[in-house]
């Protein structure tokens, strides 16, 4: 049976970039565990801030952490107090001086992770899954998406037997590497169990950088 590869992982080095950028040698495992723990802790701590991505770079003996969020004001706090506290916490966690950047996600309707988390939250509030899916699809297409696909799996509506439901609108060409496809997942913890949410959003096509530069040179 055919399985689907992660659409972001397969495009790394073509049109997508890595979320962690560093070279570690023998300390690879240590750095990887630090990154995973930091992302997990920040996601829990900043749940109200609608965090999309956390980018980590480690140049020389320091670190640069960039948080992409739909609500930067929640993280920054009054007079920037929240951001300084957060920077100290991250610095203690990584054990090196940290430079912290906060970037705003201009269109959260086109961010697959935020869309998936939005649907998961609605399911926890007992909104009908079809209504939550349809609302997300309509918002994404209004915001300029070329296509969107959503899958929710689990005991939908409290059913005895778990199943998967799909909703798709527009084009989502997973096999086209130049297609800019954002992918995000979330879990909804309901009284009947966990419901998994997956979202694919097609934003248009991008020419890989090398190809674009050679074409402009010609």
Swiss-Prot record:
HAMAP family: Ribosomal_uS3_B
GO cellular component, one term: cytosolic small ribosomal subunit
Keyword S-adenosyl-L-methionine appears in the UniProt entry: no
A Pfam family matched in the record: KH_2
Assembly and binders: Part of the 30S ribosomal subunit. Forms a tight complex with proteins S10 and S14.
Stretches assigned to the KH type-2 domain: 38-106
Superkingdom of source: Bacteria
PROSITE patterns in the record: KH_TYPE_2, RIBOSOMAL_S3
Function, as annotated: Binds the lower part of the 30S subunit head. Binds mRNA in the 70S ribosome, positioning it for translation.
GO BP, sorted A to Z: translation
Record's protein name: Small ribosomal subunit protein uS3
């Amino acid at each position: 049976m055919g399985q689907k590869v992660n659409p972001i992982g397969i495009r790394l080095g073509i049109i997508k970039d890595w979320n962690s950028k560093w070279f570690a040698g023998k300390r690879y495992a240590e750095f990887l565990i630090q990154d995973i723990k930091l992302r997990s802790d920040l996601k829990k701590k900043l749940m109200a801030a609608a965090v999309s991505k956390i980018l980590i770079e480690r140049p020389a003996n320091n670190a640069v952490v960039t948080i992409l969020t739909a609500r930067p004001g929640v993280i920054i706090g009054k007079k920037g107090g929240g951001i300084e506290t957060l920077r100290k916490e991250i610095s203690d966690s990584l054990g090196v001086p940290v430079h912290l950047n906060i970037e705003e996600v201009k269109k959260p309707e086109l961010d697959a992770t935020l869309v998936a988390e939005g649907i998961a939250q609605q399911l926890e509030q007992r909104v009908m899954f079809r209504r939550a899916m349809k609302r997300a699809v309509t918002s994404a297409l209004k915001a300029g998406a070329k296509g969107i696909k959503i899958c929710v799996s689990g005991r939908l509506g409290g059913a005895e037997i778990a199943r998967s439901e799909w909703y798709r609108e527009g084009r989502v060409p997973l096999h086209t590497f130049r297609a800019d496809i954002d992918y995000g997942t979330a879990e909804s913890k309901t009284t009947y169990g966990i419901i998994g949410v997956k979202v694919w959003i097609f934003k248009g096509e991008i020419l890989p950088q090398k190809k674009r530069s050679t074409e402009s040179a010609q």
